[in-house]
A protein has these predicted regions:
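FIC/Doc superfamily catalytic core
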Residues: 1-331
Length: 331
């Protein structure tokens, strides 16, 4: 089979930045609790893209065995997805049999033919009911998936790109009556996890969900052009953004680990730090002017507080005095 796409300068730059960030992480250092939290985020986001109404808190409660009020179908989707994510990363990403087994795990009790390729034609519709894509004819689906996996298994392409292409082609083939988006996203993560185990725990789906319209637009543009370049670029941007979010998340954890420092701060200092910390958890860095607006304090007072937080290791600073930016510390 032939997958149409072009290697662009944008792709090369994104791949370089992704590889650079990956060298800074070690899966062994990631706490088991954080891995579980990221997996729950992945599940909730991937299901939300498919219109599951449950919140992150509700999904967490379901997975932890607590009762939740919600549509039975949505609850069943969460239970299935958690089982699938727990088992799929030991599967062979180029095995059609494993692919069908993963679909069965995701959809049993929800569709008529879980774990089976569809037997009828299928269309994808936009919000106005207009057909935007028609999947492959059902009689061709098994052969197309087999050809795709055989190509991917033997391709020398870097898995970063290959995983995007497999994801794209699965969405175009649309092999199942339901669950195609979930399977495409999950299978990309599986391929990536064979390249770097960290990808088993990265909540890529959360970033896709945050840019859901961009995701659909990239699919539509690449489908119309019969060229996956735009979709590959989009997914590489998603992967990079996910890694950048993880970097911020790890800084927050490190600060939390150093929380014993806080009792040594005076009450007002602790209050200001909590304000700054909450801001940094959302935005990543803060300047003196932003800190003044946030706290309502004078420039000199803010500088004194920020300098103190740097001194005790709660914050780090970069840049000149005038344009200095502060972020959560890592000592």
């Amino acid at each position: 089979m032939q997958v149409n796409f072009q290697i662009t300068e944008k792709m090369l730059g994104l791949m370089h930045n992704i590889a650079e960030l990956l060298t800074k992480y070690s899966i062994e250092k990631r706490p088991l609790l954080l891995r579980k939290e990221n997996r729950i985020r992945s599940i909730q986001s991937s299901l939300a893209i498919g219109n599951n109404s449950l919140t992150l808190e509700q999904v967490t409660d379901i997975i932890e065995g607590r009762r939740v009020l919600g549509p039975p179908k949505d609850i069943h989707e969460v239970q299935n997805a958690y089982e699938a994510y727990e088992r799929v990363f030991s599967m062979d990403p180029y095995s059609v049999e494993d692919f069908l087994e993963a679909h069965h795990l995701l959809t049993h009790g929800l569709v008529k033919h879980p774990g089976q390729f569809r037997l009828s034609d299928v269309g994808v519709y936009d919000a106005s009911g207009r057909v935007v894509h028609v999947g492959a004819r059902p009689q061709f689906v098994p052969g197309l998936v087999e050809d795709l996996f055989a190509w991917a298994k033997n391709s020398d392409l870097l898995d970063l790109v290959k995983s995007c292409l497999v994801h794209f082609e699965l969405e175009i083939i649309h092999p199942f009556e339901d669950g195609n988006g979930r399977m495409g996203r999950l299978w990309q993560s599986l391929i990536l996890s064979r390249w770097n185990p960290l990808f088993e725990w990265l909540p890529i789906e959360s970033v896709i969900h945050a840019h859901q319209q961009g995701y659909y637009d990239a699919l539509a543009i690449s489908n119309k052009a019969n060229d996956a370049t735009v979709f590959v670029e989009f997914m590489l941007e998603v992967i990079l953004e996910t890694l950048e979010e993880v970097k911020v998340q790890e800084r927050i954890e490190e600060v939390s680990a150093n929380y014993v420092i806080l009792p040594s701060l005076k009450p007002k200092e602790r209050e200001v730090f909590e304000q700054v910390k909450a801001y940094l958890e959302q935005y990543g860095n803060i300047g003196n002017q932003q800190a003044q607006e946030l706290t309502g304090l004078s420039a000199a007072t803010v500088r004194r507080y920020l300098s103190l937080f740097v001194k005790v290791g709660l914050l780090t600073s970069n840049g000149s005095t005038k344009g200095k930016l502060y972020s959560l510390g890592s000592t």
